[in-house]
Regions:
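Broad hydrophobic/π-residue packing in well-ordered secondary structure
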Residues: 11-12, 67
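Mixed-charge, Lys/Arg-enriched low-complexity segments
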Residues: 39-72
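Negatively charged, low-complexity tracts enriched in Asp/Glu with abundant Ser/Thr
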Residues: 1-10
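Short linear sequence elements within intrinsically disordered, low-complexity coil regions
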Residues: 10-11, 20, 57-61
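A short, structured beta-strand/loop element
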Residues: 13-47
């Protein structure tokens, strides 16, 4: 089941045990990243995709903590 991490600057960030998704709330464009940071799907341009891959690296430890709390 997909869980909501947060919404910031009209970007909704959600996660499952296997992936993290960044979705633009205005356009519904999104990038879906596997836990290792590889792109599963993206309809953002390359620049935005790379931006969210970098952002993913910065927040991944927090998402991992959320996953741990979810399992309690």
């Amino acid at each position: 089941m997909r869980k909501e991490f947060c919404e910031k600057d009209n970007i909704l960030i959600t996660y499952t045990e296997n992936d993290v998704c960044f979705e633009d709330c205005k356009t519904a464009d999104a990038v879906l990243l596997a836990n290792d940071g590889t792109v599963i799907h993206s309809n953002f341009n390359n620049e935005k995709t790379e931006y969210y891959k970098d952002y993913f690296k910065r927040i991944y430890s927090t998402i991992t903590s959320f996953r741990s709390f979810d399992s309690l």
